[in-house]
C-alpha cells in the first residue's frame, strides 16, 4: 500500500462451476493489492462467448464468489463485450487476467488509456499443468461419468 492509498485489483470471468483453479486465481489476484473486485460475466455474455448458457445464473455465481475470503466485492457485468465504462467506474489500479482469458494485455491497456485510465494489466499464470482446473474439462468428466 502506498501511504494510505489502497491498491484496487479487478478481475473478470464466468466463474461457473467454481473449482480450485478459480480459487488460486483469486488468491493470486488479491496478493497484487489490498482490495479485490470481481466482475462476473452476464449470462448473455457467457452464451455468446461460449455458445451455451452458463450452468449457474450470474446472481448465483456472484453470491458464491462473495463467500470467498479473497473477494471484497462482486459486480455482474453488462451483456456484451467488456464494459470500459464499468471498469472506469470501479477505478482499478490493476486488472489481473487469467491465463486462459483471450484478452491481449497491451490492447486492453491501450483501450483503458484511451478513456483516461492508467491501469496495470497483468496476466496471471496457470498453477496446474494438467486440465483438472478447467470448467470445460469438469463438465466433460461429469457427462462421461453420469450420462452413459
UniProtKB/Swiss-Prot annotation:
UniProt entry keywords in alphabetical sequence: ATP-binding, FAD, Flavoprotein, FMN, Nucleotide-binding, Nucleotidyltransferase, Transferase
GO BP terms: FAD biosynthetic process; FMN metabolic process
GO molecular function: ATP binding; FMN adenylyltransferase activity
Xref: Pfam families: CTP_transf_like (PF01467)
Cofactor(s) listed in the protein's UniProt record: a divalent metal cation
Binding site for ATP: 14-15, 19-22, 100
EC number: 2.7.7.2
Pathway: Cofactor biosynthesis; FAD biosynthesis; FAD from FMN: step 1/1
Catalytic activity line of the entry: FMN + ATP + H(+) = FAD + diphosphate
Assembly notes: Homodimer.
Family (UniProt): Belongs to the archaeal FAD synthase family.
HAMAP family in the record: FAD_synth_arch
Biological function: Catalyzes the transfer of the AMP portion of ATP to flavin mononucleotide (FMN) to produce flavin adenine dinucleotide (FAD) coenzyme.
Protein name: FAD synthase
Source organism of the structure: Pyrococcus abyssi (strain GE5 / Orsay)
Amino acid at each position: 500500500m502506498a501511504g494510505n492509498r489502497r491498491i484496487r485489483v479487478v478481475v473478470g470471468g464466468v466463474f461457473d462451476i467454481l473449482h480450485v483453479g478459480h480459487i488460486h486465481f483469486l488468491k493470486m489476484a488479491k496478493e497484487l493489492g489490498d482490495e479485490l473486485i470481481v466482475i462476473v460475466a452476464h449470462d448473455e455474455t457467457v452464451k455468446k462467448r461460449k455458445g451455451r448458457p452458463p450452468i449457474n445464473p450470474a446472481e448465483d455465481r456472484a453470491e458464491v464468489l462473495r463467500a470467498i475470503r479473497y473477494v471484497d466485492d462482486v459486480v455482474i457485468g453488462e451483456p456484451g463485450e467488456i464494459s470500459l465504462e464499468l471498469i472506469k467506474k470501479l477505478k482499478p489500479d490493476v486488472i489481473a487476467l487469467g491465463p486462459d482469458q483471450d484478452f491481449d494485455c497491451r490492447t486492453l491497456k491501450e483501450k483503458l488509456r484511451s478513456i483516461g485510465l492508467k491501469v496495470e494489466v497483468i496476466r496471471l499464470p496457470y498453477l496446474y499443468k494438467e486440465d483438472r482446473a478447467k470448467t470445460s474439462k469438469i463438465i466433460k468428466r461429469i457427462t462421461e461419468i453420469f450420462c452413459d
